[in-house]
């Protein structure tokens, strides 16, 4: 089964235009619908801030927020039109940003979003939104780097494989993209001293499963010794001219919440090619 609906997170900046263009191209390729979703940054007006701020400040912020939303919609529709995509819709839900984004994400097959810009005024908000969606949406996220041209994605795919639920979910979620790929490499990564050091056998099961779906994949096992797993994956992705990484998104407990794990966070912060992640 292919993708029938895409959602793309839209902002009022050039980085958003690039990911909207990619989302529109993919939606057209898969004959799917595309919905643009704009959520208001957390520092904008809330019931609490509107109660304590002067009326003039509230009015100015509401005006600025409305103008930014209108510009974002205009940019979204222009990018979708340039990609000759007809099945397009727009949403700017009210309420808490993460809750709204998660609810909309669950209505789609896949969500296209962006790597937060470190220097952006809303970088903290964007990071929290991205990590929260990964943990809560129950949908794969295709995360697009903030720099680079990614009008074509999925011709040369690297699967970062572990024998885990998250990895299995990610590979299954990526099937429509993998079926169109020209090259797929499964990369199990182990640590020195593991009983299956090098992971030579750990990729056999998933490659056999992929073969049953008509996808030919090779296995390239790696051992992370003098380099951590995240940097190893990024290095190999560069070596192999990868244009898409597929991997599970991992979490760890911190008090009463779940936060993304170290490898997941490193990839999201340092990625140079789009990454499809599932939790």
Where on the chain are the PLM-derived regions?
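Small/aliphatic-rich secondary-structure junction motif
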Residues: 1-56, 136, 149, 153-222, ...
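Gly/Ser-rich helix-loop-strand patches that form or flank binding pockets
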Residues: 20, 25-29, 100-150, 236-279
